[in-house]
């Protein structure tokens, strides 16, 4: 479904001339339907797609990644921005509940990127066919609860962030694998 800005309901976004639109998908089915449009639009399956994975609370660095993704897929391509605060990256007692959840502001920022006339300070204008924002809940990402199969990150799990947050890297690998599968 497409998202109006600034409201968080599901309805079309008016696009700037020559630009695509923002679609908000909250469920696996909505994401699949949004991605299927690419398949119907190009029978060869050749619509370029880029995925920018985030936990939301978007800032200029995220917008730069989205702009680069759009540059790489070109005007006929699709950029998928995922916004998901992954509970598997947080151990008990960590800051999961304190992590900012700013979906409406994030979508507004992405819409501004899509509509901007250009220039690094105003976010570069995206010449991209479509921008899909996939913002699932934990229940959507992990419909059967915690995954039955876990990915072992190996020795990296005990250094860097893993030295103080032992579940962090396993959670990151799990969400990346799941998002890659859902956006393929």
What is each PLM-predicted segment?
Residues 2-184:
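Nucleotidyltransferase catalytic core that binds NTPs
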